[in-house]
Amino acid sequence: EFETIVVYGGDGTLNRVVNIMMHQDIHLPIGYIPGGTTNDFSKAIDENGTIESYCRTIAFGNPFSYDVGCFNGTYFNYVAAFGAFTATSYETSRESKKILGYGAYVLNALGNLPASLSNHTKMKFIHDGVEEEGTFVFGAISNSPSVGGFKLPFYEDSTLDDGKFEVLLVAALDNLEVLHNVLSGVATGNIDPKYVHAFKTDKIEFICEEDTA
């Protein structure tokens, strides 16, 4: 018998362990030691931790519960996303990440920029009794104020256990200059409601015209 499952790795490794535990109905505390490239999830808990401090917390700290999302039968503890740049995390080679760290993600994303921005997804989304629709270049449902290594100012008050997930949907635009301004606004917290949907909810349904990734 085990008292705790200890995970060393990045956001993806932790997510795989959470999925296994949820699907197999395993109820044990997870001790997480971040050892990946971005480690967004750990930053929401302790941004300045060290391996020694994480080990002390695992050995002597008190377990706590946090929100886990479910998307088409797959669980996520950090983020579920579609559209531009979402392939970057799994298309970036392990060798590149070892050499360049987070820069490997950035270079991969820049290399795929034209294809990413041309990936438009038309969909309806339903939340809190409201049905809306649009065509989007990017969408994310997250449980963290940081996504892809970037902190989102309008989600600064987000917590892991508030029963809500943060939703971000960015409209597809053919004008690259306008799209650049919109994305810059997302990064700085100055969002344009004409092009960006940003809200919190405990449940959201997406209805797409075609398979989306």
Task: Give the label of every model feature segment.
Residues 1-8, 15, 19-20, 24, ...:
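ATP/NTP phosphate-donor binding region
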Residues 9-10, 33, 80, 171:
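Small/polar loops that bind or transfer phosphate-bearing groups
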Residues 18-21, 43-45, 152-153:
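Short amphipathic alpha-helical segments
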Residues 23-141:
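Catalytic core of DAGKc-family lipid kinases
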Residues 86-88, 133-135, 146-151, 175-179:
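Short acidic/glycine-rich loop or secondary-structure boundary segments that cap or lie
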Residues 96-104, 147-150, 156-176:
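Gly/Ser/Thr-rich active-site loops/lids in small-molecule metabolic enzymes
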Residues 127-128, 133, 159-162, 169-213:
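ATP/nucleoside-binding phosphotransfer catalytic cores, i.e., glycine-rich phosphate-binding loops
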Residues 140-150, 187-190:
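Phosphate-binding core of ATP-grasp and ATP-grasp-like enzymes
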